[in-house]
Regions:
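Asp/Glu-centered strand-loop micro-motifs enriched in Gly/Pro and often flanked by an aromatic residue
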Residues: 1-20, 74-79, 122-126, 130, ...
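The start of beta-strands in P-loop NTPase/AAA+ ATPase cores
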Residues: 14, 65-67, 146-147
């Protein structure tokens, strides 16, 4: 089934939130969207992945338009709340660092340097939200646009609320 035709519908709304039961392909859809909208996806990759599909025949104006940050919170949903906080911080920081490398941003752990260069991503190993904030500032300073995808956004909360580690992994 070719579901790429729905990409056009996504572009008509500024924010999307997919709330389907487990095993409905939400993670696959986030990967499709990340690849479709990513500036870093080459024409060859695009043709290989989307060739013959509706979206390849009729691409939208925003294809390849964004710098994409794709966060998957399922990687941080294990262990105690303290363990999950540490894993979530590490995951967000790792993805921000990978984003910086992918799109050619400079990264620094020097707060003074980061404060004077808006195009620099400041890496704070203990404060992923600050790292993420400086990533957003750097993207904006370059005149780029960010497409943020958060997969399994509820996994962390479900584990914390249910106070157990055996939450369905799908």
């Amino acid at each position: 089934v070719d579901n790429t035709k729905y990409i056009r519908e996504f572009e008509e709304t500024p924010f999307q939130c997919f709330t389907r039961p487990p095993r409905w392909g939400k993670s696959l859809l986030t990967q499709i969207l990340a690849t479709y909208y990513d500036k870093a996806t080459t024409s060859e990759q695009y043709g290989t992945l989307f060739g013959g599909l509706d979206i390849h025949k009729n691409p939208t104006k925003l294809r390849g338009h964004f710098q994409v940050l794709n966060l998957d919170f399922s990687k941080a949903a294990t262990g105690s709340v303290e363990d999950m906080n540490a894993l979530l911080t590490e995951h967000i920081n790792d993805e921000c660092l990978a984003f910086g490398g992918k799109y050619g941003y400079n990264i620094s752990t020097d707060m003074i340097e980061a404060a004077t260069d808006p195009e620099l991503i400041y890496h704070d190993e203990n404060d992923a939200m600050f790292t993420l904030k400086t990533l957003g500032t750097a993207v904006h300073a370059r005149g780029e646009e960010l497409y943020l995808i958060v997969d399994e956004y509820d996994r962390y909360a479900n584990v914390c609320l249910l106070d157990r580690e055996d939450v369905d992994q799908d």
